[in-house]
């Protein structure tokens, strides 16, 4: 693996006139993505100085003074990167498909936080002979998928506990990410149609990619080396 710990400047990039941070800002979300991104960052010489899971802070310094980390909701990561509030970020492919992140560069499949985006419904229950109701937080993905199947559906936006919807008649099916399927089975549901495979992707702001490439390049190279060494 290429050693990149000393590839970046050791003095923090700060515009002293207005305290503007001129280094790299990385957007991450708590949970599985954060946990599985940490080894990649450590290999690139970037380590958080505090545990985000044990803190209420939202901005974290790292062992590299020219890299800081923002902790966001997963669904907000593409927005922060797209608008330049973060230079780069890690987001699930499911979030990118739902967001329609057309104005960021999707540079790497990090092959972490892997799962599947699927439809699911009550086990062995036939679907009604009418326009289906689909409960999901992936409204755009659901509409696009069923349209590709030639089906018109009513999509009901939910923010969590999708598994409940078919059990109480709110939706005929759900669209959600499925890992082991244990949560579905525990609630009497079964996975049905496979929509797409999901993994976390490294996304970069288009302007930052050009203007800060010298800072980004060693981190990108390290990520690539880490991915190649485990594939």
UniProtKB/Swiss-Prot annotation:
Tell me the compartments it is located in. Answer: Cytoplasm
EC class, as a word, reads transferase
- Catalytic reaction annotation: 1-(5-phospho-beta-D-ribosyl)-ATP + diphosphate = 5-phospho-alpha-D-ribose 1-diphosphate + ATP
Q: Which GO terms describe its cellular component?
A: cytoplasm
Query: Which terms under GO biological process does the entry name?
Result: L-histidine biosynthetic process
Is this entry keyworded 4Fe-4S?
A: no
Q: Which Pfam families match?
A: HisG
Q: In which pathway does it act?
A: Amino-acid biosynthesis; L-histidine biosynthesis; L-histidine from 5-phospho-alpha-D-ribose 1-diphosphate: step 1/9
Where it mainly occurs, coarsely classed, is cytoplasm
Keywords (A to Z) from UniProt? Amino-acid biosynthesis, ATP-binding, Cytoplasm, Glycosyltransferase, Histidine biosynthesis, Nucleotide-binding, Transferase
- Which GO-annotated molecular functions does the record name? ATP binding; ATP phosphoribosyltransferase activity
EC number assigned by the record = 2.4.2.17
UniProt-listed InterPro entries: ATP_PRibTrfase_cat (IPR013820), ATP_PRibTrfase_CS (IPR018198), ATP_PRibTrfase_HisG (IPR001348), ATP_PRibTrfase_HisG_short (IPR024893)
Keyword Glycoprotein attributed: no
Q: Give the Gene3D superfamilies listed for this entry.
A: Periplasmic binding protein-like II
Origin: domain of life: Bacteria
What is the stated purpose of this protein? Catalyzes the condensation of ATP and 5-phosphoribose 1-diphosphate to form N'-(5'-phosphoribosyl)-ATP (PR-ATP). Has a crucial role in the pathway because the rate of histidine biosynthesis seems to be controlled primarily by regulation of HisG enzymatic activity.
The free-text domain remark for this protein reads: Lacks the C-terminal regulatory region which is replaced by HisZ.
Assembly and partners are described as:
Heteromultimer composed of HisG and HisZ subunits.
The record's family statement is: Belongs to the ATP phosphoribosyltransferase family. Short subfamily.
PANTHER family, sorted = ATP PHOSPHORIBOSYLTRANSFERASE, ATP PHOSPHORIBOSYLTRANSFERASE ATP-PRTASE
Protein name in the entry: ATP phosphoribosyltransferase
